[in-house]
Amino acid sequence: MASQGTKRSYEQMETDGERQNATEIRASVGKMIDGIGRFYIQMCTELKLSDYEGRLIQNSLTIERMVLSAFDERRNRYLEEHPSAGKDPKKTGGPIYKRVDGKWMRELVLYDKEEIRRIWRQANNGDDATAGLTHMMIWHSNLNDTTYQRTRALVRTGMDPRMCSLMQGSTLPRRSGAAGAAVKGVGTMVMELIRMIKRGINDRNFWRGENGRKTRGAYERMCNILKGKFQTAAQRAMMDQVRESRNPGNAEIEDLIFLARSALILRGSVAHKSCLPACVYGPAVASGYNFEKEGYSLVGIDPFKLLQNSQVYSLIRPNENPAHKSQLVWMACNSAAFEDLRLLSFIRGTKVSPRGKLSTRGVQIASNENMDTMESSTLELRSRYWAIRTRSGGNTNQQRASAGQISVQPAFSVQRNLPFDKSTIMAAFTGNTEGRTSDMRAEIIRMMEGAKPEEVSFRGRGVFELSDEKATNPIVPSFDMSNEGSYFFGDNAEEYDN
């Protein structure tokens, strides 16, 4: 990106650091991972989990959720002020699964939030360690991104289900800070803004008074985050217009939807981070590995190496395919829900299938599901190669006025062609140039029309052998052009919010 110099790296966002050099960043990210690992070990002790039970991803999710809820200040305040029957605002908990007499049993545990906060701080040298909390939020968000399709949410805000590749991070909580904002897709930001504008249309006082001033500040901040994701001057100019609007209304919603559509070809820059479940970090720390000393990065080989040597298990429902469950979690661990499946198959070394072809539901088990028929199996999270993560959106030339990877939001900096029928997307723009911004719109449409689908993104970039830690010998994969590489496209995956 042109303004890269003014931006902090992901790792700095991840660790709230001021400018640091690469070694310091690796150390501070490592420190964050150490903290999560130590916390997880302590929780497994508290809950008396066996080694196997501690490596069960469902237990990991419950423990992660408990600490996130213990630190959710706003919700905790809300619960104190609006007591609801049967919910103790001071407690947090969830299902913990244990192996008893050859069967999996569900046990509901309840802890004081204060106690959980104490254990977390103790594991993090007395700090609140917000970066570690955000890291877990992003892991949950990546898991949601691979598990559910957000068609319904898209349609509700007046967007098109075809925009699902723009929805990264759509389930991240608002409190996820700079690191969270970095991984949100263009569609996610547009949706948050549209919801805000709609509230303003329906509620006369939304922008007024003391509260309205804060609201307005939040609105402009969100506009700036979205503007920073766009890589062409015309898209950014339209964002300025949306931000400066005296009284945001339907015209702004129209502009935002137009911008979201344009991002299908002129991709935004969206960060990708490998955030792994706590049950991966825990055993690594327990085995004596020192992440802070060794250094760790979320965007290089480190997560691949860690997964290569990790044992993680999952509960499996009677009619689920363990290999498919593994693919789901593998994609989440590599934040690759919107990456090209041809590329993922190459990196993983086994075929990666679209969501609708997978015989698996989500990783979480609902409280009313029957445990008697539950089995467990090992998740296969290893990869054949590793690749460097990207946030560029895959646009092919330096002015960025070119085809990004259409219908995919690239997660890896690896050469690929653009396998998608551009005319389908362009059809969404025909005849819709009225409105105040027609000059900018015309400019954006012109750039999109000039985007050549036969171009190659990330030219010359390749994947690497796992033994090639310094990334010296790129292997540039060759792909079958005829295959379209999107995971959700034309798919019937389960909805996140049904």
From Swiss-Prot:
Belongs to the influenza viruses nucleoprotein family. Encapsidates the negative strand viral RNA, protecting it from nucleases. The encapsidated genomic RNA is termed the ribonucleoprotein (RNP) and serves as template for transcription and replication. The RNP needs to be localized in the host nucleus to start an infectious cycle, but is too large to diffuse through the nuclear pore complex. NP comprises at least 2 nuclear localization signals that are responsible for the active RNP import into the nucleus through cellular importin alpha/beta pathway. Disulfide bonds: none annotated. One of its GO terms (cellular component) is host cell. Late in virus-infected cells, may be cleaved from a 56-kDa protein to a 53-kDa protein by a cellular caspase. This cleavage might be a marker for the onset of apoptosis in infected cells or have a specific function in virus host interaction. Homomultimerizes to form the nucleocapsid. May bind host exportin-1/XPO1. Binds to viral genomic RNA. Protein-RNA contacts are mediated by a combination of electrostatic interactions between positively charged residues and the phosphate backbone and planar interactions between aromatic side chains and bases. Residues 1-21 are annotated as: Disordered. Keywords: Capsid protein, Helical capsid protein, Host nucleus, Host-virus interaction, Ribonucleoprotein, RNA-binding, Viral nucleoprotein, Viral penetration into host nucleus, Virion, Virus entry into host cell. Coiled coil: none annotated. A motif (Unconventional nuclear localization signal) lies at residues 1-18. GO terms for biological process: symbiont entry into host cell; viral penetration into host nucleus. It is found in: Virion; Host nucleus. One of its GO terms (molecular function) is RNA binding. Its main location: virion. The keyword Ribonucleoprotein applies. Residues 8-21 have a biased composition (Basic and acidic residues). This is Nucleoprotein. InterPro entries: Flu_NP (IPR002141). A motif (Bipartite nuclear localization signal) lies at residues 198-216.
